[in-house]
Curated annotation (Swiss-Prot):
Disulphide-bridged cysteine pairs: none
Record-listed substrate binding positions: N195, P196, P197, Y198
Protein name as catalogued: Release factor glutamine methyltransferase
Function: Methylates the class 1 translation termination release factors RF1/PrfA and RF2/PrfB on the glutamine residue of the universally conserved GGQ motif.
Alphabetized InterPro entries for the sequence: HemK-like, N5-glutamine_MTase, PrmC_N, RF_methyltr_PrmC, SAM-dependent_MTases_sf, Small_mtfrase_dom
Alphabetical list of NCBIfam families matching this protein: hemK_fam, RF_mod_PrmC
Biological source species: Nitratidesulfovibrio vulgaris (strain ATCC 29579 / DSM 644 / CCUG 34227 / NCIMB 8303 / VKM B-1760 / Hildenborough) (Desulfovibrio vulgaris)
EC assignment: 2.1.1.297
Entry-linked HAMAP family: RF_methyltr_PrmC
Catalyzed reaction equations: L-glutaminyl-[peptide chain release factor] + S-adenosyl-L-methionine = N(5)-methyl-L-glutaminyl-[peptide chain release factor] + S-adenosyl-L-homocysteine + H(+)
Length: 295
């Protein structure tokens, strides 16, 4: 879009040019992307575009819109362009330091809420990223509190912002650390939740450009196999969970059998280890419950 030709641009005209540009760039859902970017750039609702398609747009707004569309045409995720992503009915700030929350992780939240005992409970969210798991758990239940871990200081700052945004910051502690960070007493938690990096090096090269070229590699790839963090998470969860405490850990849809096998050294300490599926019917996360024995 040529900024010099935008002095009399209308909403529908901008939308048409943006859609054509995004179609040419082979971006997913080009019309929807154009509408969302236009609403973001002009602080509009989508209904405003429908009701006033011939509204004249100021040149400065046209230029801003054109710049944002150009970013989308490179494959940059829409969530990074508008600065947020919806998760479990709430908007979360995201940026290139954080993984963009995925819908399949919402099933982990649902399982946690269904499985936790009533009354006050404590959890850890290891590899918190945007904080979507930790913040959502606290927002859904006022009697939950927890610790959110991440190695990325910018990600922790984003997660802390999201906690304040949704009014749960007083029940969350944000700490820089990895999956081996032992900050908690043995037997002190009711839930260990984690969506760790689990993409293998081979899988990474085949990811879409939106993921591979823009989302933080460290939040996606732990090493050659994709399972490099899993054993450490299981060991730490075995230590810090109370009797009947729950481990929920997300993984890749082809990793279920390998993930379950990592519990073998701790088989006497877990009363239940299950591979759970997401709403698409794909293996997606481990559900495990500690027994009464101490490690």
């Amino acid at each position: 879009m040529n900024p010099a030709s935008t002095s009399h641009a209308t909403l529908q005209g901008l939308l048409r040019h943006a859609r054509q540009r995004l179609e040419a760039a082979e971006v997913d859902a080009p019309r929807l992307s154009a509408e969302i970017i236009l609403c973001h750039a002009l602080s509009l609702r989508r209904i405003d575009i429908m009701l006033t398609p011939d509204r004249i747009v100021e040149e400065a707004d046209c230029i801003l819109f054109s710049e944002l569309v150009a970013r989308r045409a490179t494959g940059e995720p829409l969530a990074y362009i508008v600065g947020e992503k919806e998760f479990f009915g709430r908007d979360f700030a995201v940026n290139p330091s954080t993984l963009i929350p995925r819908p399949e992780t919402e099933h982990l939240i649902e399982t946690a809420l269904e499985s936790l005992r009533s009354g006050p409970a404590r959890f850890v969210d290891a590899g918190t990223g945007s904080g979507c798991i930790a913040v959502t758990l606290c927002a859904e239940r006022a009697d939950l509190s927890g610790l959110a871990l991440d190695m990325s200081a910018p990600a922790l700052a984003t997660a802390s912002h999201n906690a304040r945004r949704h009014g749960v910051a007083q029940r969350l502690a944000f700490v820089r650390g990895d999956f081996t960070t032992s900050l908690l007493r043995s037997g002190s938690l009711d839930l260990y939740a984690s969506n760790p990096p689990y993409i293998s090096e081979a899988e990474y090269t085949g990811l879409s450009r939106e993921v591979r070229d823009f989302e933080p590699r460290s939040a996606l790839v732990p090493g050659d196999t994709g399972l490099e963090h899993a054993a450490a998470i299981i060991a730490e969860a075995t230590r810090v969970l109370r009797p009947h405490g729950i481990l929920l850990m997300e993984f890749g849809c082809m990793q279920g059998a390998d993930m379950a096998s990592l519990f073998t050294p701790y088989s006497t300490l877990w009363e239940m280890v299950e591979v759970r599926r997401d709403l698409a019917g794909l293996d997606r996360f481990i559900f495990a419950r500690r027994n009464l024995l101490q490690p």
